[in-house]
Amino acid sequence: MSEQTAPAGGEPIRFDTKIAVLLREDLQVWQRLNVCAFLMSGIAAGNPETIGEPYADADGTAYLSMFRQPVVVLEGGKEMLALAHGRALDRELSTAVYTADLFMTGNDRDNRAAVRAVGRDALDLVGVAVFGRKNAVDKVMKGAVMHP
């Protein structure tokens, strides 16, 4: 996933960075989508270099910019999330977390308070997203499987 096909006749674009999100395997579909969306907003907000140029269609209608590179979506058990979280912090990668408590809140202030109330090793993680050098992200996510 470190390569993107270029338009006809162009060379593939290769990335030395990677964006990956790890979701807990026991989440309901709506929870997976919600967690992924929130985590990706964190990666985008904390890493403006991940954002590409604005889009436009053939009629000139403008659309918002999106990530400049693919996002790898993985899944794993509770232990895998804890392991990946620790690895990401040890490697000082840009990291976003989503805990089970956030399903009970309805705004950013309460979300931040819910995370702040629990120590790092006791967080009930349901999602972790990371951005960094490709090889470092691969090491962080080692053992996780591709999301179906």
Enumerate the language-model features and the residues they cover.
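Positively charged, small/polar-rich N-terminal and surface patches that mediate targeting and assembly
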Residues: M1-P148
